[in-house]
Regions:
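Soluble acyl-CoA-dependent acyltransferase catalytic core bearing the H(X)4D motif
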Residues: 1-11, 19-21, 26-477
Length: 477
């Protein structure tokens, strides 16, 4: 009997804690097209994608009487038409606002756990003959960068779709019976115990060698490592924002767009990076939103993924670790905000605890699920804003004969009040703002504040306007 791969520890924790629905991890991406795509080509490319990346044909199956993570098992009832649906929108919903409204409702619905954890909707009859493709995928399947790698098979560089050659073979479904799942779970646990013992032995030998050669350095490193680990699992408490305290299952999607060269120029002018410039706009927007509401905001708690993905990693699964940290919001302008952010983000990216995140998540998988869910909730619901940055295609691409004019990510709130995702595409940057309406009373006002803060950041990269020469009055003799 073939054994499908198991969820990695981090993926298993994300999947398991959704016993609390506020912690759901669902990614939604909107691709706006200049015309309706060719239905046959969409089906052929999507079929090819599911064969190249088997997780798109696999369901997550638990293990009876076992603490082993869920197993990816090819769905014997895989129904392509269930996962990709075509919808003609009524005229009242044919604008971008209608697309966003449809995407919100799609995002709010949970997955059918007896099927693979992804869905797609192709919306047609939009204004000016346009169309939109909405992709919804569970975060346990892949992260943002992995998702872009998966979706590359959907895109072409010209309007005429390329011939990609023979269709790969479809994975064969070999579902295990109850006894088989019990046996596989026990075998997995036995292998894990042996692996952990080997890892512990190697670590102990290395620690002894280091302690002998550098006792002071090893003591300081151990203390720093322990402090970081404690901080990583310490409950976060209430959100730091006095305004954005509510949490719900609802979402509100909005979009901010900015030219990519302008944002890069601002990063160069401030000797920072695109990510720092992006975060400065996020912080500035939240600060102004609170100011307009007559509320003082001293700092915010941020959840930001730190990518550990390498070129050798496949597209499936997650290759990032979460960093949670507090950012002060008292800076009065964008330049000062960037200066304040540089050391904070540098420290977050170099936190020693990040290197032990896999060990921590392996520990969480063996705890009773209610305990893990409660611990995850204490970490995630105290976050004010989550922010993520994913590079998209650097040039214009086409999907089944239609040009992609906009590519916008909406990352999961997963307990936060807001998640702001950045995706670059063909010389532009799109911010997908995912607000919890229970936390953000006026999502449109927050979006305007983020847009204004982004304009302030972008202005840092533009040359100063030359002063107009003032003509002195002529002296009379």
């Amino acid at each position: 009997m073939a054994t499908d791969p198991r969820m990695a520890s981090f993926d298993a924790v994300m999947f398991g804690v959704e016993g609390d629905p506020l912690l759901r991890s669902v990614i939604t991406v909107i691709a706006l097209l200049d015309q309706e795509p060719d239905r046959a080509v969409v089906r052929e490319r999507a079929e090819r994608m599911t064969r190249m990346y088997p997780k798109l044909r696999q369901r997550a199956v638990g293990n009876p009487i076992s603490i082993a993570p869920p197993r990816w098992e090819t769905d014997p009832n895989f129904d392509f038409d269930y996962h990709i649906r075509w919808r003609r929108l009524p005229q009242a919903m044919s604008s971008m606002a209608g697309v966003l409204d449809y995407a919100e409702r799609m995002n709010e619905q949970d997955f059918d756990r007896s099927r693979p954890l992804w869905e797609c909707a192709v919306l047609t009859d939009l204004d000016d003959g346009r169309a939109a493709v909405l992709m919804k995928i569970h975060h346990s399947i892949t992260d943002g960068m992995g998702g872009m790698a998966m979706s590359a098979v959907l895109f072409d560089l010209t309007r005429v779709p390329a011939d990609l050659g023979p269709m790969p073979s479809a994975p064969i479904a070999r579902p295990a019976n109850m006894l088989g799942r019990i046996r596989q779970g026990i075998e997995y646990e036995a292998r894990q115990v042996l692996g952990e013992l080997s890892t512990a032995t190697d670590y102990a030998v290395s620690a002894v060698k280091t302690a002998v050669s550098d006792p002071l350095g090893s003591t300081l490193a151990a203390a720093e490592f322990t402090a970081s680990a404690v901080k990583m699992l310490a409950p976060q408490g209430a959100p730091l924002s006095p305004l954005m305290t509510g949490r719900s299952l609802s979402v509100k999607f909005t979009i901010v767009e900015v030219p990519l060269p302008d944002l890069k120029a601002a990063a160069r002018a401030t000797t920072s990076s695109l990510n720092v410039a992006f975060m400065a706009a996020v912080v500035g927007g939240l600060r102004e939103y609170h100011r307009q509401a007559g509320c003082e905001l001293e700092s915010i708690r941020v959840n930001m993924p730190i990518s550990v993905r390498t070129e050798d990693d496949d597209a499936g699964g997650n290759r990032w670790v979460p960093a949670r940290f507090v950012i002060p919001t008292d800076a009065d302008d964008a330049a000062e905000r960037i200066r304040d952010l540089l050391p904070v983000l540098r420290e977050a990216q170099q936190d020693p605890a990040l290197s032990m995140s896999d060990i921590v998540y392996r520990l969480l998988t063996v705890l009773p699920r209610p305990v893990t869910t409660a611990l995850a909730g204490s970490l995630m619901k105290g976050v004010d804003v989550a922010a993520t940055n994913v590079p998209g295609p650097p040039v214009e691409v086409y999907m089944a004969g239609a040009k992609v004019t906009m590519l916008v990510p909406f990352a999961p709130k997963a307990g936060a009040a807001v998640n702001i995702g950045l995706m670059s595409y063909a010389g532009r940057v799109f911010l997908g703002i995912n607000c919890d309406p229970a936390a953000v009373d006026d999502p449109d006002a927050l979006t305007d504040c983020v847009r204004a803060a982004m304009a302030e950041v972008v202005a840092l990269g533009k040359p100063p306007k030359p002063r107009k020469a003032t003509r002195r009055p002529a002296k009379h003799r």
